[in-house]
């Protein structure tokens, strides 16, 4: 996952590579300005690691985006997405990909993204 943080008079803004741009919008919407949410998510990631190899899932429902993760994968999606990811029936050879509504990444990449944001925000605040 590629990402970049910038700081201006309007505050911090996260940007991600095209296939992960929903993560940037999630961070900009649900985390920036809500530091406690960041700490809660990082704490849940630690609980997830401690539970391994047992299955552990966590959901954070925000105002605009929801975050789902287990010990392997993280999913962020727009709350008003018409169909739940599990309910989508895809015909053979057809892929469902809506880069503006849902994105996936590994838990380790996601944790590095959050830690990099935390470090950046600590430097500029």
Swiss-Prot record:
InterPro entries: UPF0231. This is UPF0231 protein HD_1708. Pfam families: UPF0231. Belongs to the UPF0231 family. It comes from Haemophilus ducreyi (strain 35000HP / ATCC 700724).
